[in-house]
UniProtKB/Swiss-Prot annotation:
Subunit relationships: Homohexamer.
UniProt main location, coarse: cytoplasm
Annotated positions binding substrate: 30, 44, 56, 142
GO biological process per UniProt: phosphate-containing compound metabolic process
Function: Catalyzes the hydrolysis of inorganic pyrophosphate (PPi) forming two phosphate ions.
Ligand binding (Mg(2+) 1): 66, 71, 103
Protein name listed in UniProt: Inorganic pyrophosphatase
Cited Gene3D superfamilies: Inorganic pyrophosphatase (3.90.80.10)
PANTHER family attached to this UniProt entry: INORGANIC PYROPHOSPHATASE
Database matches in SUPFAM superfamilies: Inorganic pyrophosphatase
Length: 178
C-alpha cells in the first residue's frame, strides 16, 4: 500500500493520522516523504548539530498556506520508523514563522490504544513545561547556521486552535481536488 492511500483520519479533527518522516532523537538529518512515490528523501543535513526532540511528520490530505501538509510533532518516549503511520490526538500547536512565512506545527499524542501513557493529555496546558521548552528551543534554533534561514516562535496555541488549523487544511486540500 502506498502512503497516498492514507487518509487524514477517520474521526477528524479529534484524531489524525500522522505519517512519520523524522524519528525522535535522530541525527540532524531532515527527511521528507515524497507525496507522489511514498519514498523517503533526504531533504538536507541540518547545519546545527541538534537532535529532533520528538517524532516529526505530517497529516496526509491536508494543505497549509505554505503549500505543504500540516506538520505534526508526536510526543512519545520512543522513536518511530520513518514512513510509519500513527493515530494521534492534536493537543496544541507551536505557532511560528520562518523565512517562507507562517509554519505552524501541531503537537499531538498517540491515541490511548497505541500508548496509554498520555491518555490524560487533552490540551497544551497538560503537557510538561519542560517538553514544551525543549521543543520550542529546537525549532527556534535548528536553522541557526543556515544562511538566509530563520525562525521566530510566536508561542503555543491550545487544542481548539490546533483542530481549527487542521479543519482548515483539510478543506483547503479538498478545494484543490478536481
Amino acid at each position: 500500500m502506498g502512503l497516498e492511500l492514507v487518509n487524514a483520519g477517520n474521526n477528524l479533527p479529534e484524531e489524525i493520522n500522522v505519517i512519520i518522516e523524522i524519528p525522535k532523537d535522530s541525527e540532524p538529518v531532515k527527511y521528507e516523504v515524497d507525496k507522489a512515490s511514498g519514498a523517503i528523501f533526504v531533504d538536507r543535513i541540518l547545519s546545527t548539530p541538534m537532535r529532533y526532540p520528538c517524532n516529526y511528520g505530517y497529516v496526509p490530505n491536508t494543505l497549509c498556506g505554505d503549500g505543504d501538509p500540516v506538520d505534526v510533532m508526536v510526543v512519545l518516549p520512543l522513536p518511530l520508523v520513518p514512513g510509519s503511520v500513527v493515530r494521534c490526538r492534536p493537543v496544541g500547536v507551536l505557532q511560528m514563522k520562518d523565512e517562507a512565512g507562517n509554519d505552524e506545527k501541531l503537537l499531538a499524542v498517540p491515541v490511548s490504544k497505541i500508548f496509554s501513557g498520555y491518555s490524560h493529555i487533552e490540551d497544551i496546558n497538560q503537557v510538561s513545561a519542560h517538553w514544551l521548552e525543549r521543543i520550542g528551543h529546537f525549532f527556534e534554533h535548528y536553522k541557526d547556521l543556515e544562511k538566509g534561514k530563520w525562525v521566530e516562535i510566536d508561542g503555543w496555541g491550545n487544542a481548539t486552535t490546533a483542530k481549527q488549523i487542521l479543519t482548515n487544511a483539510v478543506q483547503r486540500y479538498k478545494d484543490t481536488l478536481p
